[in-house]
Amino acid sequence: MTIIDKAISRKRLTELAQNFYGEMIKGVVDIDRQIMALDAELHSDLEKLLLENGSNQESLWGINLYPDVEGDDFIEFDSLI
């Protein structure tokens, strides 16, 4: 699991996706702090990482990223965590 606080390339996202799901990577975004956690099997693991690092629960959203997909289908908004 890693916290991302700056731009990340699609190539790096593709590499991270191989750790669990191959074509998809789970993430949790802190919309207030403008950071996200990536690279875990479960959104709840990423949520916990962000909470332990100062995020507030009400600011967290779960997402799925599909690095090899273009356009709107690149990101899937999963839920408010």
Regions found by a protein language model. Name each.
Residues D39-D72:
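Amphipathic, interaction-prone secondary-structure segments
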Residues D5-K6, N19, E58, Y66-P67, ...:
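Metal- and O2-centered redox machinery and metal/ROS homeostasis
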